[in-house]
A protein has these predicted regions:
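Flexible loop/turn segments at secondary-structure boundaries
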Residues: 7-9, 46-47, 67-69, 136-137, ...
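Aromatic- and acidic-residue-enriched segments that line the glycan-binding/catalytic groove
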Residues: 10-23, 75, 81, 124
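Short glycine-biased active-site loop of nucleotidyltransferases that positions the nucleotide triphosphate
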Residues: 8-14, 30, 120
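N-terminal glycine-rich flavin-associated loop
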Residues: 1, 22-65, 75-109, 138-160
Length: 194
């Protein structure tokens, strides 16, 4: 199943296999009163953000706007807001799927809870997800981000500091270590701060 097509080329499709492409099913609707968003199986994270942000609402999303909502969510969904709001899968409140027997099912904690539980932890192994419904959260502030960079030789010292310091941070702050190779070929360790 191709949602956003963000996977490494060739890793998601078997030679001679069949691909179900959901790219044209990419609409997102927002219900501000219920603080819910509904995204079709081919929607991208950029579509989701574009629909929710003008309403002052967010859910956990990734850092690359052309990632598919489906693959991101069914893979757990780690993003910069996960400390505050949980993983994307934690914010999934319902999904529409077509199972291998051809049945269309809407699953949630109240409706087919076992299948919903499996979907939230087992990825796309239980059917083709055609719609995702997310809990949204008010978010009306400006965000500032940047990177702090050190030579890679200081990686152990930086990571030791990070490990002891990170657990006491506010859930409003995202800090993530990244190893990078700079354009001149030098390696660095960086902390992304949002």
């Amino acid at each position: 199943v191709r949602g956003g097509g963000h996977s490494w080329p060739g890793l998601s499709v078997a030679d001679g296999g069949l691909m179900i492409d959901l790219a044209l099913q990419n609409s997102v609707t927002v219900d501000p009163a219920r603080q819910r968003a509904s995204a079709q199986g081919g929607a991208l994270l950029g579509h989701l953000d574009s629909a929710t942000l003008p309403q002052g609402l967010v859910t956990t999303a990734g850092v690359v706007s052309h990632t598919g909502v489906g693959g991101f969510t069914l893979g757990g969904g780690f993003g910069r807001l996960n400390r505050k709001f949980g993983l994307a899968v934690d914010n999934l409140v319902a999904a529409d799927i077509v199972t291998a027997d051809g049945q269309f099912r809407t699953v949630s904690a109240e409706q087919e809870p076992d299948l919903f539980w499996a979907l939230r932890g087992g990825g796309g192994n239980f059917g083709v997800a055609t719609r995702f419904e997310f809990q949204l959260h008010p978010f009306d502030r400006n965000v500032l981000s940047g990177m702090i960079v050190w030579p890679v030789e200081q990686a152990r010292e930086v990571l030791d500091f990070y490990a002891g310091w990170y657990t006491g941070l506010s859930d409003d702050l995202y800090v993530g270590p990244v190893m990078l190779t700079m354009p001149d070929g030098t390696s660095v360790i960086a902390m992304e701060v949002v």
